[in-house]
């Protein structure tokens, strides 16, 4: 995944798991549990990221927690972060931060589709699920 991301010519990318639904059903009895919005437009630009989901139509993929930014955009992100109130800095998730940055600066992040067997591990149960399905 990292090799594909590094070799991609795009500078400001948010890779996503296109096979998210299979893994979500393995992790949760209720697939809407812990699911977040991930919506992009026809130009493959992120429109919405993070936040509660009401239907699967709001999930075009799963944010993988991996990002690729140019040094110029990294500086912009850091400067934007410094403007947030201290209490918000301590609580904000990455998806909420990226959405807030996008909303307030009108910056567009591009998406990069990944078709790998990606497993998010937040809990011990997630670890057991990943271990069961990942090949050595």
Q: Which residues make up each language-model segment?
A:
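Conserved alpha/beta core of the MobA/IspD/sugar-nucleotide pyrophosphorylase nucleotidyltransferase superfamily
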Residues: 49, 56-136
């Amino acid at each position: 995944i990292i090799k594909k991301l590094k070799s991609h010519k795009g500078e400001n990318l948010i890779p996503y798991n296109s096979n998210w639904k299979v893994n979500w059903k393995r992790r949760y009895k209720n697939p809407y549990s812990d699911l977040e919005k991930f919506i992009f437009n026809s130009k493959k630009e992120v429109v919405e990221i993070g936040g509660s989901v009401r239907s699967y139509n709001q999930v075009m993929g799963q944010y993988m927690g991996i990002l690729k930014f140019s040094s110029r955009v990294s500086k912009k992100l850091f400067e934007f972060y410094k403007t947030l109130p201290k209490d918000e800095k301590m609580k904000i998730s990455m998806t909420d931060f990226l959405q807030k940055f996008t909303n307030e600066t009108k910056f567009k992040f591009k998406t990069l589709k990944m078709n790998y067997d990606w497993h998010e591990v937040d809990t011990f149960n997630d670890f057991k699920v990943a271990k069961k399905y990942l090949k050595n």
